[in-house]
């Protein structure tokens, strides 16, 4: 019987591509449209450097002028100014020992797909944790006065009224919000109250909704002292682009480990950009070449750039 060698599978170029594809298709953040792949962001992620300026035109304002038949009356043009966001590239990796990998392969016709699914599932969870940490950072200061609805002082639980008051933070731009991310405890409470609806999609896949918002359940949502954090998002509120590590997947064998029994290690690497639109990464307290989760969650590393109504993220704090 032929033996499947891990090294013969993971060194194939299509393996890393398969892991990348699975990690996004499995993610509710991607499937809901909250995180949107952007070719321009992907081009930056594939280029050299760690931080990138994203220029944009500031909105224009002012009132129209009244026409005149006096040729000496001249209109004064207003300025059209340009500013920029700043995105940061994330360099992330992980590794697993052969014991776990070998056991997980088991029997089957497609061990490559089995390994790819395992690693992709891990990347899906890890990328969601990364995003939650970034949200913690931007709401700690940059968006704290404009995009946060806090009802913890009144000991109010998450409800329809709380969410509707939260979306009002964007005023007449609130219709741009389409999904809500919440802790499983809050999701279960809404289920008990029979407030969750299930909408069918292609392939008979059903997903939960609340007040018309698609619900994404993630226990990475902060919970502190009985205070739960939920987030309202609009489509494309987080831009995403995948880079190209020199060696995305690597297999190592240490024949002397275990007193000669040998040890196998599988390493996976990703370079990508997760950028909340309308924010600037300042790097004010970043120590290394790429931010840690703690640094992403640090208030001073983010600055608000866009007008309030253009930033399609709202934080809700409730009991």
Mark where each language-model region is.
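Protruding loop/beta-arch "assembly-hinge" segments enriched in small, turn-prone residues
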Residues: 1-28, 229-237, 245-319
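Extended, solvent-exposed, turn-rich assembly/linker loops in the middle of proteins
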Residues: 140-218
